[in-house]
Amino acid sequence: MQDEPRYVIGMDAHSRKLAISIWDWSDRFNACMHRELKCIDIDSMIKTYERNVNIDSITIIESSTNSASLKKMLNAAGYRAEIVRADVIANKERKRRICDIRDAENLALAYIKGDIDEFVWTPSQEYTQYRDIMFAYRDTTKEMTRLSNRIWNMCSRKGYKLPIRNSTNKVSILREMIIETNIEGFAKEQLEMLLEDFDRLLQRKTELSRRIAEIVLSNPRMLRLLQLHGVNYKGAFALDAAVENPHRFSTASKLSAYGGFSPIVDSSGEEEEHAKRKGGLKKPLDGEGRRDVKFFFTEAGQTVLTSCANTKLGKWGWKMINRGKSRNKVVCAIGRKLLTYSWHILRGDSTPNRHSEEFFKRKMRTFYQTIGAKRMHELGYGTRNQFAEAQAKLVYGDLPISTADSEEIADC
């Protein structure tokens, strides 16, 4: 537990400018305003701190786009800084006193009065890079979808043969179609431009996928997540990149809520209306949480129902559907269960049995093929069977051999 500082600084920051309100808290029962500084350039923030702020201080920063980078800059200069949620001062704003310096003042007073019960967690430099890779993959996929829709729209509008859904062969097939149908003029120029952009994004997505796969290969915790049915290496990477430290979640349900799998419950008043606005009517989730984790684990839930129906989790899902439950709700419920299992894996809890060992080995062989035999040999690995056996030994090596009666069917 750190000692309380003498000075408390509230900071309201924007993309280029920031304002700080400095409070002297040497008298714990009577904090007083020390100084206010407005319209500070972010580039000159450290120099301003060195001239005006005592090292025995804490800076309270409202959560925003650049708050994590500001915290790192202050920490590197020797100042303590913490990030708080943006709603900390929501009830303290006044219609006639809304400005940056008042927000900075309210942040400092919120800390002094004990209204801040926790700080926002910020990732390490390594995991910040992992998140950047995940965001780059997400943005590339979005741009590919937009371009694919534009190509489809143009072909439909002009009466050309509609492209296939397979991204890998789409460009080559459409270029052959341009030659065969003798498309000319501006339509040809526009279509070729769209295909060129789509091909560039496809190559970028392939490079990012390979990079993610190699990161997962070098991270034992991410590899252990692959023992879950329906979870591919991108889902394992997205979850671990978002979590980093699983011990900040005291229970599995808190990790599930963080991953976006907090169900809408029957409530009243503003809470219910807010949940409906975020999640939509008749949707199973409340719309909060990390969308990247939610996407991959919802996809994992669909995979369990379609390809892993003979597993224990798949049988449970189909039992719920046969009882009349909505398929979407069952998919979300399976995704939530997978996140619950992930919480135990990330914390290092031992695998309970060998029921999924053969499934894990098959998954490791597929993962080996994803990276490619040539690259795996360059990284120092043997054949795919040797790789699968070695990884399975790390996960299941200390467990007793399963008997035929107790072994779970894992046809996935």
Where are these regions (language model features)?
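Short alpha-helix plus adjacent loop in nuclease-associated cores
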Residues: 82-122, 272-288
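Low-complexity, acidic/Ser/Thr- and charged residue-rich accessory regions of DNA metabolism proteins
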Residues: 317-335, 339-412
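A short, charged helix-loop
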Residues: 108-132, 173-183
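Glycine-rich, often acidic, oxyanion-interacting loops/wings at catalytic, nucleic-acid
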Residues: 138-224
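Gly/Thr-rich phosphate-binding beta-strand-loop-beta motif of the actin/hexokinase/Hsp70
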Residues: 2-25, 107, 238
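Phosphate-backbone recognition surface of nucleic-acid-processing proteins
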Residues: 224-227, 233, 238-323, 327, ...
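Nucleic-acid-processing active sites and adjacent nucleic-acid-binding tracks
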Residues: 27-56
